[in-house]
Amino acid sequence: MLACLLSFQSADSLAQGNLTPPGAPSPTMHTLDQIYDRGDPRIRITNSSSTVTISIPGSYFLTQDLTVSSGNAINITTNGVTLDLGGHTITSTAASAVGAGVLLNSGLKNVVIRNGNIVGGVTNNAVGVYSGTGFAYGIYYSSTAPVNVCVSKVSVIGCLYYGIDLNAGDATLVEDCFVRTVGSYGILASTVKNCTAVECGYTSISGDQVSDCRGETTFGSYGLFGVNVQNSYGSSASSGYGLYAYVALNCAGTSASSYGLYAYYSAQNCQGQSTSGTGLFSRNVNNCYGSSSSDTGIECSGTAINSSGVASSGLGLDAYCAENCYGNGVSGLSASTALNCLGVGSNGDGVYAGLTAMNCFGSTGAGTGLVAFIASFCHGTATTGTDLSVTHNINSY
């Protein structure tokens, strides 16, 4: 019976099916390389339109621009994070400036943020009012200041309040960064290196150690503020100090109506200029230049050496002790003790030495060429005034 049944099956029914293999399988989800770069162990951030929260320690990088509609763009909530923005730009479309481009949780440690841009829509109306869209802060922290945090090669533009604020706490560093058009502080950290902050509503750059920086404030307190400042420039377009430091080396500062450069303890190889305030002030001045249109060129409460002060309608140089100095103004140079100095006055005294003048020369138009209690080997001359006024004269004329 079985043989009979088999005999009725056709040849086609006994033939094999199509032996040609199908094509390669089509991908139905992300490849491994899209999630993880075998040559780069960092974690990719692929989000482009909503807030990113980093809550696990590690190294992260942004793969594209990120735009949020409100609040913070990136929240870092854990220690030990390195965030590379990959040269991309973080923006916000919030109608009123709110949130931060990157916000650090309170008291975070060991965080690095680098290589990117944070852009808001805040502008300055040229009379000190900042308003607009986007972010309130560029990079900021909540509550307790961070420790051992570095921000490098980041630009922040158009934020309502702070640009990059890490506080002047322990081991915070901002380097190679740029900030423009923010309503309060531009950059604030314990160390600031090779940075520029301009058009800031308050202090443009502030740090304990500041070097190779430029800070310009429109209406604020200081163009640049630091404890030890080197190779830097600060400017205030209004009533703020151009540059303020405890120790300033190779620096310059300008101000419209306050101190151009103010160095509490010492200024060396520095320049200060002010329209209606003092050009340069310090307790100790060495190899400096200060100028003012209507106040004092250089004011020194200690010793000024190898320095020059010029004032169009004020006192050129005023020091407790002046050595190898030059002053030019309505009154040229004033000191308790003057050594090897030159002073030129238009209507006031050329050189005024409250105690002793030695090897000095003073000239004036209508005032007194040289005034001293004791003058040794000095000379004074006046066009229409008095050449010399000396109580004890030693070889002076």
Sequence positions of predicted segments:
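Bacterial N-terminal signal peptides
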Residues: 1-9
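Acidic Gly/Asp/Thr-rich repetitive segments characteristic of extracellular carbohydrate-active
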Residues: 20-61, 71-75
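Extracellular beta-strand/beta-solenoid scaffold signature
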Residues: 68-73, 95-104, 126-143, 158-167, ...
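All-beta strand scaffolds that present successive hydrophobic residues in beta-strands
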Residues: 60-62, 82-85, 108-115, 148-152, ...
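Ankyrin-repeat and related helical/solenoid repeat scaffolds used for protein-protein interactions
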Residues: 340, 344, 348-385
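Right-handed parallel beta-helix/beta-spiral solenoid domain characteristic of secreted/periplasmic
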Residues: 37-48, 59-69, 81-137, 157
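N-terminal non-globular leader segments, chiefly Sec-dependent signal peptides
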Residues: 22, 28-31, 103, 110-111, ...
